[in-house]
Amino acid sequence: MEEDELELAAGLEAALELAPAVQAAIEQVFPSQDPLDRADFNAVEYINTLFPTEQSLANIDEVVNKIRLKIRKLDDNIRTVVRGQTNVGQDGRQALEEAQKAIQQLFGKIKDIKDKAEKSEQMVKEITRDIKQLDHAKRHLTTSITTLNHLHMLAGGVDSLEAMTRRRQYGEVANLLQGVVNVLEHFNKYMGIPQIRQLSERVKAAQNELGQQILADFEEAFPSQGTKRPGGPSNVLRDACLVANVLDPRIKQEIIKKFIKQHLSEYLVLFQENQDVAWLDKIDRRYAWIKRQLVDYEEKYGRMFPQEWCMTERIAVEFCHVTRTELAKIMRTRAKEIEVKLLLFAIQRTTNFEGLLAKRFSGCTLADGTVKKPEAPPPSTNPFLEDETGTETDEIVIEKSDADKPKKPKVPDNPFHGIVSKCFEPHLYVYIESQDKNLSELIDRFVADFKAQGPPKPNVDEGGAVLPSCADLFVYYKKCMVQCSQLSTGEPMIALTTIFQKYLREYAWKILSGNLPKTTSSSGGLTITSLLKEKEGSEVAKFTLEELCLICSILSTAEYCLATTQQLEEKLKEKVDASLVERINLTGETDTFSIVISNSIQLLVQDLDAACDPALTAMSKMQWQNVEHVGDQSPYVTSVILHIKQNVPIIRDNLASTRKYFTQFCIKFANSFIPKFINHLFKCKPISMVGAEQLLLDTHSLKMVLLDLPSIGSQVVRKAPASYTRIVVKGMTRAEMILKVVMAPHEPPVVFVDNYIKLLADCSTDTFQKILDMKGLKRSEQSSMLELFRQRLPAPPSGVENSGSLSLSAPTPEQESSRIRKLEKLIKKRL
């Protein structure tokens, strides 16, 4: 029985558990503070709240009665709600029927209202029918009166127009004709009426007669053949121009064409192709002539033509078109006589004249012209050629002093740019050839100056400075580019770029690479073999202080040239036409300067490396098995440190402006010296325990010196670059591990082999063989050791074999020879 009650209670509890969302909705709709309504109601806690102490149990009967009373009230409420829901369905159906009846009544009322509205509308139409007829009659009457007035005005105007035309009263005709034309527009829809059509035809006839009459008057006043009529313009012609404004635009264009043609007829005679003044050396006279003609026109005919005709500008523009055609014709005929100075003189005078036109005229008559307005290049923050606009209005001459002229404010766009000077573009090859010749002479002068003046003097403040010749070269490049961009931004700019590329390569070869100190006495030029390869036991001459400074100076110059060449490429792309941008590419030239930088660094590395070779050779020839005690660092270490302290501060001070390349020098020296040091370590055999300890001490000393290499001998101590530190630590730690393996006892063999694999992580049997030779083991012992070593080697990962050996061991002579051949081919390809 008790079990059934427990199951029932558990079922009730489970049934009362509601979802959190449902519980939250109930609490929102029926908020309650009663603990019994809480979702997390706990009966034990509730009872403990009612009876907190044993004494409170005395009131248990009272509490039970209250709860029973509350239960009875809840039961009554539940019964009331249940009874209330008994008739809900019937009440709902009744309410729905009542709603449907109400809707039907509403539809009936709406229909009645609609019928009444239609009847009201019909009644209003009947009432206003007569009023609408009156409105239409009034509107038609007004239109008829207006039309009759217009007809009267048109008829009278046509009669007056014909009479005034016969009497050439152009002043009155100008105003009357415009009015007649405006009135005639009102009769466009009545052209089917014969009388209206007749009036329209009379107006057209009057217009045609006026046009022919005005053209005849201008032909009489300004005949196409013969000289201009003396005296100023008549008032009749001035009024005729006002009439022409109202007539067909072709009349106006014909008047303008005849007048300009007659006005420039003298120019065509004076500057015929066979005349002496027609050649480029007297091009000033052409522009002086048109200036006089424009002044003469303003004085005599300025008031004759309406201001909106812009006759002065039209005369100037037509002069430009004629001049461009005539100059192009004569230059084709006498192309062999064109010299660069003459061409630049003519272009400079022409561009000055075009600038004068831009100041005087707006260019409004060029809307349908043949000259395309040039697009302004986008603004640039590039420091290269930042003051290039300063030479735009100056005379174009090929002198270095032009680069020092003060910067002028940027001039606005010139709508007349190229209107005449376009004819010179096909002949700009003369200018390009001249620049080719000038640059060739400039490079030869740089070579001669370097030979005469010699390398820069060794000075801490000046050593490693950029050679002055490279600044002169780029200043000249700047002036050439500005000149050419003023002349043309098309194919001539591409041709000039090709010239720039040619002499950048020549500068890199003749001035930079050609003056690098040679490492051999052979008469051949600098080769990569002489930079990288040395014969065993040969004596390599050490560079002097002057030669070290020269190498650093060439390196700094190459870096400057590389950066400036990149800026030059960007500026050329800004100047050239958008369709030609892809043809500007100076990557090959920047690569050339990069090779010069690499060669310079390699020379510095080789010099210091070669200086350390005798010390390393001495180390390998010492009798290390006879060393009896460990002392201070060995003499060969002192010698290496001495060479480093002599060379590195000089190189660092001379490369102060190019810190990244000094870092490259340090990295390349470490990559060269450390493998060579390890190779010489392997030559030290046999080695006693004490000898190995001395070598370990020496190796640690060299490691400390190499770590301090970037700031050695400097008053300002800087932290070495992390990339350099990693190389030194990795390489010299390998040397220390080799010596520690040599110091370890070879008995038992298994422990020795495992210790070797653990310390060196080198799976190469050649390296292990060298370690055994350093320990002085006999061949029989070495054979067993090698066999054990092969057995104890860990299995390499798939696809990888001897990775540790490849990454840690020094390159073999065959590998080095292959690298040298590849590098030689690369340099030949670039240079």
Curated annotation (Swiss-Prot):
Q: What InterPro entries does the database record attribute to this sequence?
A: Vps53, Vps53_C, Vps53_C_sf, Vps53_N
Leader peptide range in chain numbering: none
This protein's UniProt keywords: Coiled coil, Endosome, Golgi apparatus, Membrane, Protein transport, Transport
Q: Taxonomic classification, please?
A: Eukaryota, Metazoa, Chordata, Craniata, Vertebrata
BP terms from Gene Ontology? endocytic recycling; protein transport; retrograde transport, endosome to Golgi
Q: Does the keyword Membrane apply?
A: yes
| Record's compositionally biased regions (Polar residues) | 800-815
What do we know about how this protein assembles, alone or with others? Component of the Golgi-associated retrograde protein (GARP) complex. Component of the endosome-associated retrograde protein (EARP) complex.
Similarity-based family? Belongs to the VPS53 family.
- GO CC terms of this entry: cytosol; EARP complex; endosome membrane; GARP complex; recycling endosome
**Protein name, entry field:** Vacuolar protein sorting-associated protein 53 homolog
Q: What is its main location?
A: Golgi
Question: Among its keywords, does the record have Protease?
Answer: no
Residues folding into a coiled coil are 54-141
What's this chain's function? Acts as a component of the GARP complex that is involved in retrograde transport from early and late endosomes to the trans-Golgi network (TGN). Acts as a component of the EARP complex that is involved in endocytic recycling.
Location comes to:
Golgi apparatus, trans-Golgi network membrane; Endosome membrane; Recycling endosome
- Membrane topology listed for this record: Peripheral membrane protein
Which residues lie within the region annotated Disordered? 370-391, 794-819
